C-alpha cells in the first residue's frame, strides 16, 4: 500500500526529547512516516538521528512528555522486544549477526522453534530451515537457510538481516548507512530490494550522508540539526543546496568550492612510471603538478588504494619509479616518502590512521613531536599550541585538545588525521576516500581544505568512490580498471569529466563500443 492509498500515518513520533548527563540530544522532535514510503533522515553527525532511532528501537527510553503512535494507537516501547512486537526492525551499520550460526538460526534468534516443550525443548533446526525458505526466496537470496553466516559476504549478511526483519513481520524498517561497505553492484541490488519492500507496504526509514542515494530513493526527507527537527521536504522539492542549508543552518554555496578555471597546472611535482606490485597494480604511470587536484576513480577492486600505497611506499613494488621533484625514493619506505614531502591519508582512519585511545593533541603531534624535543624531553607547551592552531584552522569540533580522538564524530576524526599530515608541510597529499562516513558539513570543510592546499601549490590526489565528489573537486581524473589506468578525463585532454564517461572507462564499455565499430 502506497502513501497515496493510505492517508493515515503508520508511525508518528511526537515531541520526543532525550537528555543525557549535561547533553540534550533531542529536543521536542517529531517524525511522521507512512506505509509504502521511503522516508530518509538526514543531519550532520551529532544531529540526533541515531538517538531518535534508538528510542524507536527500544535501545533508549525517551524523556517524559513525548509519545509514539503506530496506526494511530499510542504504544510504549520500553525495550527491543517491545519494538519488535510493534513491528519495528533496525539494521545498523555494524551488522548484528552471529557468524558461527546458520542463516536460519540467525533469522530465528530469540524466537527459536523447539520440539515438544516450547520453552525447554531441543531446538528444531530443520523446522527453522523450512520456515525461512520462503522469505529467502522472496528476497532473491543466493544462499540457503543452512549456510553459515561466516561464509557470506557483507552484502549477503545484510540480506540476512533484512530477511530476519521481514520474517518477524516488521512493518517499519530502519536502515542506517547500509551502503557504506557495499560495491556499486551490491548497492544497486540493495536499492531494488528496498523498492520491493516499499511496494509491499513497508515503511522504510533510510539514514545516509550520500546525497545521490537520497535523491534516488526518497519519497520524503526529514532533517535534524543539533537535536531539533528542522523540516521535511517532498521528493519534488529536493535540492542539494536546500538540504545542506537545512542541515548546517547556513547556505553553503558552491558545495565543492572548486573554481573551474581553464586548466593551467604548475610545475611537475610527482612522476610515477610503470609502477606495479605483480598482482593488483599492473604498470601504472601518472604525473601530478603543483596546485593540481588529480582524481582517481574506478570500481571497487580496480586497484586505486593499492596504487596509492605503492606510490607512498607502504607496499612493495616489483617494478617502477616514483620521483618527487628530482628525488627518487625507495621501493618500500613510507619514511622516505614523508621526508621527501609526500603523505598519505588512509581510507581506514580507525585501524590504520588514528590512535583512538590517545588525545586529539597527541594524534596531531605524533608525526612531528621530534621537532619539539629538547635534550630528550618534549616541549609540551609547543605541542599544545600546535593542537590549538590545528583545531582552529580545520574547524575541528572538540571541547578541548585532551579529549580522546575515539570519542569524536567521523568528520572530526578525519580532520584530526588530516591536520597531523599537514603538520609535516607536504608537497604532495594523497587522500584515499577522504569524506567516507562524514557528514555534509564536514565534507564541505574538507573540500575547502583541499582547494586551499591546491591554491598554495600543493599537489593533491583524491581517490573517491563518490563520482559527484570526484567531478566536483578534480581538475583531471584518471580512471582505473583491473589494475591499470583505463583512461584520462579533463586537463589537456579536453574531454569533459562526467559520470557517464567515468563509468564507461571503469567498466570497459567504452572500449567494447570502440571494438564493435
Swiss-Prot record:
Signal peptide positions on this chain: none
Transmembrane segments: none
Gene name as annotated: rbsA1
Pfam families: ABC_tran (PF00005)
Catalysed reaction equations from the record: D-ribose(out) + ATP + H2O = D-ribose(in) + ADP + phosphate + H(+)
Naturally occurring in which organism (per UniProt): Burkholderia cenocepacia (strain HI2424)
PANTHER family: CARBOHYDRATE TRANSPORT ATP-BINDING PROTEIN MG119-RELATED, D-ALLOSE IMPORT ATP-BINDING PROTEIN ALSA-RELATED
Positions that bind ATP: 43-50
Role summary: Part of the ABC transporter complex RbsABC involved in ribose import. Responsible for energy coupling to the transport system.
Gene Ontology cellular-component annotations: plasma membrane
InterPro entries noted in UniProt: AAA+_ATPase, ABC_carbohydrate_import_ATPase, ABC_transporter-like_ATP-bd, ABC_transporter-like_CS, P-loop_NTPase
Entry protein name: Ribose import ATP-binding protein RbsA 1
SMART domains named in the record: AAA
Subunit (UniProt): The complex is composed of an ATP-binding protein (RbsA), two transmembrane proteins (RbsC) and a solute-binding protein (RbsB).
Location within or outside the cell: Cell inner membrane
Domain ABC transporter: 11-251, 263-507
Amino acid at each position: 500500500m502506497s502513501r497515496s492509498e493510505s492517508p493515515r500515518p503508520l508511525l508518528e513520533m511526537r515531541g520526543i526529547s532525550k537528555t543525557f548527563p549535561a547533553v540534550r540530544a533531542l529536543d521536542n522532535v517529531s517524525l511522521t512516516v507512512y506505509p509504502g514510503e521511503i522516508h530518509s533522515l538526514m543531519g550532520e553527525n551529532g544531529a540526533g538521528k541515531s538517538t531518535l532511532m534508538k528510542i524507536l528501537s527500544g535501545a533508549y527510553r525517551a524523556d517524559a512528555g513525548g509519545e509514539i503512535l503506530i496506526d494511530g494507537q499510542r504504544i510504549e516501547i520500553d525495550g527491543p522486544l517491545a519494538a519488535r512486537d510493534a513491528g519495528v526492525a533496525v539494521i545498523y551499520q555494524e551488522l548484528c549477526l552471529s557468524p558461527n550460526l546458520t542463516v536460519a538460526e540467525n533469522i530465528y534468534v530469540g524466537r527459536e522453534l523447539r520440539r515438544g516443550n516450547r520453552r525447554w525443548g531441543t531446538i528444531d533446526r530443520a523446522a527453522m530451515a523450512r520456515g525461512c525458505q520462503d522469505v529467502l526466496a522472496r528476497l532473491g537470496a543466493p544462499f540457503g537457510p543452512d549456510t553459515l553466516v561466516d561464509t557470506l559476504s557483507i552484502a549477503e549478511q545484510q540480506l540476512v538481516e533484512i530477511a530476519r526483519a521481514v520474517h518477524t513481520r516488521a512493518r517499519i524498517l530502519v536502515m542506517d548507512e547500509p551502503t557504506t561497505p557495499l560495491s556499486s553492484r551490491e548497492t544497486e541490488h540493495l536499492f531494488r530490494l528496498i523498492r520491493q519492500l516499499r511496494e509491499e507496504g513497508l515503511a522504510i526509514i533510510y539514514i545516509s550522508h550520500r546525497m545521490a542515494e537520497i535523491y534516488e530513493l526518497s519519497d520524503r526527507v526529514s532533517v535534524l540539526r543539533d537535536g531539533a527537527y528542522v523540516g521535511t521536504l517532498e521528493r519534488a522539492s529536493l535540492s542539494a543546496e536546500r538540504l545542506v542549508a537545512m542541515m548546517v543552518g547556513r547556505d553553503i554555496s558552491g558545495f565543492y568550492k572548486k573554481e573551474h578555471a581553464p586548466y593551467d597546472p604548475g610545475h611537475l611535482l610527482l612522476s610515477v612510471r610503470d609502477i606495479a606490485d605483480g598482482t593488483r597494480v599492473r604498470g601504472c604511470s601518472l604525473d601530478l603538478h603543483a596546485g593540481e587536484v588529480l582524481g582517481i576513480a574506478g570500481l571497487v577492486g580496480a586497484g586505486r588504494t593499492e596504487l596509492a600505497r605503492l606510490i607512498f611506499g607502504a607496499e612493495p613494488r616489483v617494478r617502477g619509479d616514483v620521483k618527487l621533484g628530482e628525488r627518487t625514493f625507495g621501493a618500500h619506505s613510507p619514511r622516505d616518502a614523508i621526508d621527501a614531502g609526500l603523505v598519505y591519508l588512509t581510507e581506514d582512519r580507525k585501524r590504520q590512521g588514528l590512535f583512538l585511545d590517545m588525545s586529539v593533541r597527541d594524534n596531531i603531534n605524533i608525526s612531528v613531536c621530534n621537532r619539539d624535543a629538547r635534550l630528550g624531553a618534549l616541549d609540551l607547551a609547543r605541542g599544545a599550541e600546535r593542537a590549538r592552531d590545528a583545531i582552529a584552522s580545520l574547524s575541528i569540533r572538540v571541547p578541548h585538545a585532551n579529549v580522546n580522538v575515539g570519542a569524536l564524530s567521523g568528520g572530526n576524526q578525519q580532520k584530526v588525521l588530516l591536520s597531523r599530515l599537514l603538520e609535516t608541510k607536504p608537497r604532495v597529499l594523497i587522500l584515499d576516500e577522504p569524506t567516507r562516513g562524514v557528514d555534509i558539513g564536514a565534507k564541505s570543510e574538507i573540500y575547502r581544505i583541499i582547494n586551499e592546499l591546491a591554491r598554495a601549490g600543493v599537489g593533491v590526489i583524491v581517490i573517491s568512490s563518490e563520482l559527484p565528489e570526484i567531478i566536483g573537486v578534480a581538475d583531471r581524473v584518471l580512471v582505473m580498471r583491473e589494475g591499470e589506468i583505463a583512461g584520462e578525463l579533463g586537463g589537456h585532454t579536453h574531454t569533459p569529466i562526467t559520470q557517464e564517461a567515468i563509468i564507461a572507462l571503469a567498466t570497459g564499455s567504452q572500449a567494447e563500443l570502440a571494438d564493435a565499430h
